[in-house]
Amino acid sequence: MEDLTKTISNMDMFSLRINRVLDFLKTKSVMLEKLNAIEIFGGTGQNNVAVAISVKTFEIWEIDGKLKPELEKKFPNAKIKICNSIERLKQYQNTSKFDLIMIDNPISVFGAGKNPSEYCEHFDMIKNVGKLIDKEAIVIFLINKKPFFFNKLKKKNELWRKRRQEFYGNINTNDMSIPFLTSFYTELFRNMGLTTIFTNSIPRHNPHLDYFIFMLRKNDVQ
């Protein structure tokens, strides 16, 4: 467990993984320099530098106002909004749309204020991602295929397991396959009126975390 913790804390390794995502998009003839991009869970921005310098515009949403100076320093040309990303997206009626939507979501239950376990992974916001799309967009988010549970977080782990089971259904959510997840999210997006043009998964931390990439098009677009 100590070795795993050390690996998880190595953000340089994670930031390198995003370059593989960008390389994949280039193989699909995606012109990154023409994309308007957004990161919905900004954090310190550690994993987004490569994205920001590759795209046309970059917007960051982050709940922690204390991180704003660091984000402004790392991303001088980005538009930075301090907000609850999930609630903002739920109420989103802005005309601003994006071509590349990054969701570097937490990997367990999380929240703010009186309810630190209010949300889980990307489950509470993925259904609203279409609000950010004009005609089509690339959506990239994290999926925990094989979660690890720290013993000292027993109550939090129980809530996390419950939320995963509710979201994914009657399967073993402790060991999910890429084919299952690809099918699951393709169907989820289809039910939201979004057609999958292409998809791929790229490891961020084996065997647990993967970046899942979906190129989506709204069904009412000809």
Each language-model region and where it sits:
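Class I SAM-dependent methyltransferase Rossmann-like catalytic core
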Residues: 1-30
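A short glycine-rich, Lys/Arg-flanked "PGG" loop and its adjoining helix->strand segment in the class I
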Residues: 119-135
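A short SAM/SAH-binding and catalytic strip from SAM-dependent methyltransferases
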Residues: 100-120
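Conserved beta-strand signature within the Rossmann-like core of class I S-adenosyl-L-methionine
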Residues: 136-144
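Short alpha-helix
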Residues: 175-192
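A short acidic, Gly/Pro-enriched loop at the edge of an enzyme's catalytic core
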Residues: 90-101
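Conserved class I S-adenosyl-L-methionine
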Residues: 32-43
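Conserved SAM-binding loop of SAM-dependent methyltransferases across substrates and taxa
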Residues: 44-55
